[in-house]
């Protein structure tokens, strides 16, 4: 069996400096 892909939570956008 193939391992299930781990669900990565959406990352917040980087603050524009």
Swiss-Prot record:
> What name has this protein been given in UniProt?
Apidaecin +
Its GO biological process terms?
defense response to Gram-negative bacterium; innate immune response
Q: What does this protein do?
A: Antimicrobial peptide active against many Gram-negative enterobacterial and plant-associated bacterial species. Not active against other bacterial species like H.pylori, P.mirabilis, B.pertussis or N.gonorrhoeae.
Alphabetically ordered keywords of this record: Antibiotic, Antimicrobial, Immunity, Innate immunity, Secreted
Q: Provide the induction entry.
A: By bacterial infection.
Disulphide-bridged cysteine pairs = none
For this record, the Gene Ontology CC terms, alphabetical, are: extracellular space
Lineage: superkingdom: Eukaryota
Localization recorded for this chain is: Secreted
> Is-annotated flag, keyword Secreted?
yes
| Similarity section | Belongs to the apidaecin family.
């Amino acid at each position: 069996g193939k391992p299930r892909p781990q669900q990565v939570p959406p990352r917040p956008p980087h603050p524009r400096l």
